[in-house]
Regions:
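Sec-dependent signal peptide recognition
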Residues: 1-7
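Hydrophobic h-region of N-terminal signal peptides that target proteins for export
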Residues: 8-17
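Sequence/structural signature of beta-propeller domains
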Residues: 16-282
């Protein structure tokens, strides 16, 4: 029996490959930046990575707009958000679909646009009202998406900053989304300004500009590591001021944007070879 279990484990390892180790945030250091974001002068508010286009998408608060960027921060195109209000977060959902968070309205707005589209209408978009207590200065500030569970994560910015799981109703239902408070997520942070969910490794990244850090938690909100965004830490000469958006690409590079229009790129530092690695076989 033990022999059969061993063979089964070996076969599973060949099929799925070894479990991928999750790089801890405290292993990251600045690789590039600050870089001025192309086509943006102010109010960069949210960030997401589009894996199929290998692009970054940034949402602006004023004017209400999305800009698509190359990974170096250069502008590819602009998409106007017609009749949207107080847009503070964005997340890619797959294909040409995105979700945009409206801070004061407390809405998750579902939008879809083709590669050549230059605008999106709020009136024609599907809205999910989170029914989280928000106002013009303390509303939804970040959004992330779990494609496997098909649920969202949203953040309330400050004065009891918090992360909520948002479970949408079934397509045929008129019910409101279900909001579940993640009581452990972001505990001790002065505010929450951005979110990213890494579905591959089942971890949530929580950005705080007032606490100047990114916190890594598991899917239940329990912290496992953090990246410090202060001058003298993580390869930074100066503290990142007003960090507003965060995302990972498919190479595990970490992107942070800050107001008014700056982009920072962090990468995992190369591990130093151990004595056994350097000795090798002779």
């Amino acid at each position: 029996m033990k022999h059969l279990l061993t063979v089964a484990c070996l076969l599973l390892g060949q099929v799925f490959g070894p479990a991928e180790e999750s790089p801890r945030l405290d292993q990251y250091t600045l690789a590039r930046g600050p870089v001025v974001i192309g086509g943006v002068s102010q109010n960069a508010s949210g960030l997401t990575y589009h894996a199929k286009r290998d692009s970054l998408f940034v949402v602006l608060d004023a004017p209400q707009r999305i800009v698509e960027l190359d990974l170096d921060g250069s502008l590819k195109r602009k998409i106007n958000l017609n009749k949207f209000d107080d847009t503070e977060g964005i997340v890619w959902l797959g294909e040409n679909r995105f979700a945009v968070a409206e801070e004061a309205r407390g809405n998750i707005v579902l939008v879809e646009f083709e590669p050549k589209d230059g605008g999106v209408s709020w009136k024609k978009a599907t809205k999910l009202n989170t029914e989280i207590q928000v106002n013009a200065t303390n509303g939804l500030e970040g959004i992330a998406y779990d494609p496997l569970a098909k649920r969202y994560f949203v953040a309330r910015e400050k004065r009891s900053p918090a992360v909520f799981k948002i479970i949408p109703p079934k397509p045929e239902s008129d019910a409101a989304p279900t909001a579940i408070l993640m009581s452990l997520a972001g505990r001790g942070l002065r505010d929450i300004s951005g979110l990213h969910y890494d579905a591959k490794r089942k971890r949530l990244l929580i950005l705080s500009h007032e606490s100047a850090c990114v916190v890594e938690t598991n899917q239940y909100g329990i912290e496992s590591s953090r990246l410090l965004l202060r001058g003298g830490k993580s390869g930074l000469n100066r503290t990142i001021f007003k960090a507003e958006g965060i995302s990972l690409d498919n190479r595990a590079r970490l992107y942070v944007i800050s107001e008014p229009n700056l982009l920072y790129v962090f990468q995992k530092t190369k591990s130093q070879p151990t004595d056994s690695d350097s000795s090798g076989s002779k």
